């Protein structure tokens, strides 16, 4: 295998041997991987989203499901129930009266769960930032993974946010968050 001096030669030899074995098996049509990599790959390609459309951003969110953008080609399918959803898209102005309902729906989602905050109102209160009845960002109620800016953001911006979420899942994994 490899010639190396030092205390960690066994680990280096194992890595070299694993790489050689993987090359030999790939030629025969096999693949070596870990269970965590397979789970991350499957979760990344089959995210189920739930809408929490509160205002005009929800119209742009609907555009992503239409044939022109077709977000389902990325494995991002809509679900009606929070118990079947991995991702919640908060789109629009979140009021103080609606905040407990948002938290309740978030708590019903299974782990790992992700939140996309869509639009200026969901990100930080937007146009209604100084109103007495508006929550100044949904991140005060639920943890947000991806922020999509704009008033309202375009469907392309939401698609980019979805792709960034998939990239984040690939990078961080899903078993231990």
From Swiss-Prot:
[4Fe-4S] cluster binds at residues 56-57, 121, 151. One of its GO terms (cellular component) is respiratory chain complex I. It is an enzyme of class 7 (translocase). Its main location: membrane. Its cofactor is [4Fe-4S] cluster. InterPro entries: NADH_UbQ_OxRdtase-like_20kDa, NADH_UQ_OxRdtase_20Kd_su. It is found in: Cell inner membrane. Binds 1 [4Fe-4S] cluster. Keywords: 4Fe-4S, Cell inner membrane, Cell membrane, Iron, Iron-sulfur, Membrane, Metal-binding, NAD, Quinone, Translocase, Transport, Ubiquinone. Its EC number is 7.1.1.-. PANTHER family: NADH DEHYDROGENASE, NADH DEHYDROGENASE [UBIQUINONE] IRON-SULFUR PROTEIN 7, MITOCHONDRIAL. NDH-1 is composed of 14 different subunits. Subunits NuoB, C, D, E, F, and G constitute the peripheral sector of the complex. This is NADH-quinone oxidoreductase subunit B. It comes from Rhodobacter capsulatus (Rhodopseudomonas capsulata). The lineage of its organism: Bacteria, Pseudomonadati, Pseudomonadota, Alphaproteobacteria, Rhodobacterales. The gene is nuoB.
